[in-house]
């Protein structure tokens, strides 16, 4: 019975999953039905649309109803016809004709205004022509357009009258003067100036010749006269020229006066434009008469018609007299409703809460309002269902793991019970000092009385400090596994929630659970999420995170040594932790988990290599030496990548080739073989990397060259890898000078062999500059500046932001530092040039081999330097490495039978391995 009482409430609290599927189905069904009904409605929603629908007879009158809501608003409904009746088509044609008539009248009015303006321009142009040509206007005048009768309308003629202005120097006067023109220079100059001015008047906009051929001919005459005025021409030659020009002008004048296409002065722009507008007016008048005839005919058919226009009831004649602009805007709505009829036909519509108008009062039948409960149901049901769904989801979240709302403040720490933790110190390698620090904790958990009997106090808290991936969490689990005690694990971010007080409640609950399972270990990973400095946040020291931290401080200082609870925490940001959290009595011991050295990396690789099938020839010590700065997680990932690469190549064991490739992938990035590099780019990269390798092999204090490659990885097009022989604990001056020469080797090789330099040495120059600046300003290795530290770096601020660089020396000292910096870099570059000049043959050979093989290992580089290089041996070695541990397919087909065919030949097959 006790078991039933315990389990039945849990079964009642669990909500059936089928309910949620049913809930989603109901919501989907309601929305679908609403969309179905709304999609079948016609697009009528405003009362002003009804004027056009009623005028064009598009609605069924018997189904047009309205329901009064108050004195101003009504709801109306109706249905469209299946086809437009004949009367509706006649009505629409009538409205369209009225709109066309208004448009024609407007265009005709604009054309008439244009004719008035152009007629004035024509008179001015012809009068000006008569004045400059000396040709008098006839008494009857020049007729540009005759009187024209178009139906009942008349277009008045355009006749130009006017006397000639005798004061203007004209063509006729110059023709008379040239007959008795003296041949003196002054007389010729005066006559030429008058002729030049006359030709300019022919080209003036006042005349406005529109023919391009005539204008070009007149411009040529203008240029000839201008040349005669600027050049020295004999008298007879000048007179002959002027006579020719006058004859040409006379001919042009006669051509302008001569009728063309039935019109004089047709070559003038103003006359041509006038004729175009005149013809346009004639055309518009004819269209107006035709439209008026059609309107009269349709008006006879619609004598009894009633039109609803802007809330007015009008006859057909009254509709025609409406303002054209107002009618045009109103007719746009009629056109839209007429065009929409094809999609609205046979459909019903309903529009609620619309203002009353005349068409509703006259044509729609009134009815009493009826309640639509189904409409209310469809309207509010989706809202109710969504609110219910949100309520149930929220209630399930609040219930948490234990099925009650009060469990929201319970600790989410995961308990690894006694006997379940299989991790021991045997699984931890490379951090021996940290393991030694934690041996006492293991002894306490196994035998607490050993320490308390002597009056000693066991550390209440242990803080593991180290970079990411160094094994802080792993060593904490190893402590619990070695002592075989319960292990509570939780992340620092699990304490902070959106509800106030939840974090502090979880802290209290976690320590209560730990006391019940004492002796045990509580491990808080990434404690900096909850243990940051107080008072630095936006909440001014009173936010939820700080309340959680306060509760943690109280709990850590509140339990005694006899309770057997040890708190372990891990962080990679000890600088941001609150000082009260770090004081003795809370975290008594700080264990620094450093990045492993060469020996540590070898031990870590050996631990992870136990579960990987490695080729016995794989040198784990060489891998450890080639991965400086790698954490335990990096090394584990390296071996895992090597195993994946070997499996991809169908090998039965992981060889040194896969390990080296995985190391490069983890540390430097994946090969970018898809990057297109032309032959010149490959050659440049090969010279650059060969320069690094040659200088590195020739200097005394450089690490051995491990590999040279021109395969792009990450952001680099190539790389030269060095294999450190020992841990780098300090830097020596001679070593740094050699390292600077190695860094400058790539740029020096480009300068010597290519005669130019590229941007590929950007990282080399930046790294060399950083080293030299540290030598001068931090390590006191400059002969000129002495053993003085010129750079200061501040400690990290309490807010958690990084340190900053402070300059505390004068501008003159800065100049000396810059000069010394340039001197050392120039010396390193010159040293690299000297080394490469003395090993040109080896560098050229290494470059050629890099272009062919793309990668050279340490053995290849040594053979090139020893002049014992053999490319065939390299190819054979690469082929042997490629076939090493290759899987042999078990599904090979049997060999084909050797049967003779009719022509006496045997069947032969190509085989490949």
Curated annotation (Swiss-Prot):
The chain crosses the membrane at residues 17-37, 374-394. It is found in: Cell inner membrane. InterPro entries: AAA+_ATPase, AAA_lid_3, ATPase_AAA_core, ATPase_AAA_CS, FtsH, P-loop_NTPase, Peptidase_M41, Peptidase_M41-like. Residues 899-913 have a biased composition (Polar residues). Residues 1-100 are annotated as: Unknown. The keyword Coiled coil does not apply. It is a multi-pass membrane protein. It holds the Pfam family Peptidase_M41. Residues 101-913 are annotated as: ATP-dependent zinc metalloprotease FtsH. Its cofactor is Zn(2+). Its EC number is 3.4.24.-. Residues 887-913 are annotated as: Disordered. The keyword Hydrolase applies. Residues 38-373 are periplasmic. Residues 1-16, 395-913 are cytoplasmic. ATP binds at residues 466-473. GO terms for cellular component: plasma membrane. Disulfide bonds: none annotated. Zn(2+) binds at residues 688, 692, 764. CDD domains: RecA-like_FtsH. Binds 1 zinc ion per subunit. SUPFAM superfamilies: FtsH protease domain-like, P-loop containing nucleoside triphosphate hydrolases. Homohexamer. In the central section; belongs to the AAA ATPase family. This is ATP-dependent zinc metalloprotease FtsH. The lineage of its organism: Bacteria, Pseudomonadati, Chlamydiota, Chlamydiia, Chlamydiales. The gene is ftsH.
């Amino acid at each position: 019975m006790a078991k039933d009482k315990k389990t039945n409430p849990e079964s009642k609290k669990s909500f059936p999953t089928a309910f949620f599927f049913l809930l989603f189905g109901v919501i989907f069904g309601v929305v679908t039905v609403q969309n179905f009904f709304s999609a079948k409605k016609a697009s009528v929603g405003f009362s002003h649309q009804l004027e056009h629908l009623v005028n064009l007879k598009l609605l069924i009158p018997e189904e047009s109803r309205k329901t009064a809501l108050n004195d101003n608003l009504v709801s109306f409904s109706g249905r469209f016809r299946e086809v437009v009746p004949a009367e509706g088509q006649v009505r629409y044609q009538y409205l369209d004709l009225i709109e066309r008539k208004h448009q024609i009248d407007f265009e005709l009015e604009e054309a008439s205004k244009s004719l008035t303006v152009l007629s004035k321009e024509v008179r001015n142009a012809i009068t000006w022509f008569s004045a400059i040509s000396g040709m008098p206007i006839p008494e009857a005048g020049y007729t540009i357009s005759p009187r024209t009768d178009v139906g009942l309308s008349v277009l008045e003629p355009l006749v130009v009258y006017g006397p000639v202005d005798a004061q203007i120097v004209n063509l006729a006067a110059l023709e008379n003067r040239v007959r008795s023109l003296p041949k003196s220079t002054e007389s010729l100059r005066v006559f030429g100036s008058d002729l030049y001015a006359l030709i300019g008047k022919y080209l003036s906009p006042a005349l406005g010749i529109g023919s391009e051929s005539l204008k070009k001919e007149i411009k040529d005459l203008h240029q000839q006269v201008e040349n005669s005025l600027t050049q020295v021409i004999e008298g007879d030659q000048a007179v002959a020229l002027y006579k020719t020009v006058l004859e040409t002008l006379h001919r042009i004048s006669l051509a302008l006066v001569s009728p063309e296409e039935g019109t004089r002065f047709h070559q003038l722009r103003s006359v041509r434009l006038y004729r175009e507008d005149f013809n346009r007016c004639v055309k518009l008048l004819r269209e107006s008469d035709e439209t008026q005839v059609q309107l009269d005919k349709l008006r006879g058919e619609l004598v009894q018609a009633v039109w609803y226009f802007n809330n007015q009831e009008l006859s057909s004649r009254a509709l025609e007299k409406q303002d054209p602009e107002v009618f045009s805007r109103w007719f746009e709505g009629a056109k839209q409703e007429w065009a929409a009829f094809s999609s609205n036909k046979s459909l019903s519509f309903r529009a609620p809460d619309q203002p009353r108008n005349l068409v509703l009062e006259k044509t729609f039948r009134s009815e009493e309002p009826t309640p639509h409960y189904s409409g209310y149901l469809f309207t509010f049901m989706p809202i109710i269902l969504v609110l219910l769904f949100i309520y149930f989801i929220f209630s399930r979240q609040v219930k948490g793991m234990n099925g009650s709302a009060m469990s929201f403040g319970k600790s989410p720490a995961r308990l690894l019970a006694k006997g379940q933790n299989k991790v021991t110190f045997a699984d931890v390698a490379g951090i021996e000092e940290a393991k030694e620090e934690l041996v006492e904790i293991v002894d306490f958990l196994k035998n607490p009385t050993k320490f308390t009997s002597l009056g000693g106090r066991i550390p209440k808290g242990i803080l593991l400090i180290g970079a990411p991936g160094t094994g802080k969490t792993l060593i904490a689990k190893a402590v619990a596994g070695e002592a075989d005690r319960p292990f509570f694990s939780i992340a620092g971010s699990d304490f902070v929630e959106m509800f106030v007080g939840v974090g502090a409640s979880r802290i209290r609950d976690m320590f209560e659970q730990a006391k019940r399972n004492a002796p045990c270990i509580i491990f808080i990973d990434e404690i900096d999420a909850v243990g940051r400095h107080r008072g630095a946040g936006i909440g001014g020291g009173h936010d939820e995170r700080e309340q959680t931290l306060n509760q943690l401080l109280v709990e850590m200082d509140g339990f005694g040594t006899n309770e057997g609870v040890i708190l372990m925490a891990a962080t990679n940001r000890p600088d941001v932790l609150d000082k009260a959290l770090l004081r003795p009595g809370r975290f008594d011991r700080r264990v620094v988990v450093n990045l492993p050295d060469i020996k540590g990396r070898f031990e870590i690789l050996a631990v992870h290599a136990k579960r990987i099938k490695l080729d016995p020839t794989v040198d784990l010590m060489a891998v450890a030496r080639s991965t400086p700065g790698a954490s335990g997680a990096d090394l584990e990932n390296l071996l895992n990548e090597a195993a994946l690469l070997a499996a991809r190549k169908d090998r039965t064991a992981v060889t040194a080739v896969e390990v080296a490739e995985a190391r490069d992938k983890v540390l430097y990035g994946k090969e970018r073989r898809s990057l297109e590099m032309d032959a010149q780019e490959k050659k440049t990269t090969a010279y650059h990397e060969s320069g690094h390798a040659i200088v590195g092999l020739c200097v005394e204090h450089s690490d051995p060259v491990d590999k040279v490659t021109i395969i792009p990885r990450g952001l680099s097009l190539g790389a030269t890898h060095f294999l450190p022989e020992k841990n780098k604990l300090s830097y020596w001056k001679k070593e740094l000078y050699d390292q600077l020469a190695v860094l400058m080797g790539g740029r020096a090789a480009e300068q010597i062999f290519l005669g130019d330099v590229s941007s590929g040495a950007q990282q080399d120059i930046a790294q060399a500059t950083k080293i030299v600046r540290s030598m001068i300003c931090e390590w006191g290795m400059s002969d000129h500046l002495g053993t003085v530290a010129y750079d200061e770096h501040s400690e990290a601020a309490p807010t958690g932001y990084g340190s900053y660089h402070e300059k505390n020396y004068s501008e003159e000292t800065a100049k000396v530092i810059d000069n010394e910096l340039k001197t050392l870099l120039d010396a390193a570059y010159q040293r690299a040039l000297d080394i490469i000049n003395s090993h040109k043959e080896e560098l050229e050979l290494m470059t050629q081999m890099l272009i062919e093989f793309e990668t050279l290992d340490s053995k290849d580089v040594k053979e090139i330097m020893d002049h014992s290089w053999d490319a065939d041996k390299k190819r054979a070695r690469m082929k042997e490495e490629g076939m090493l541990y290759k899987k042999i397919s078990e599904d090979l087909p049997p060999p084909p039978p050797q049967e003779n065919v009719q022509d006496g030949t045997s069947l032969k097959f190509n085989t490949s391995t």
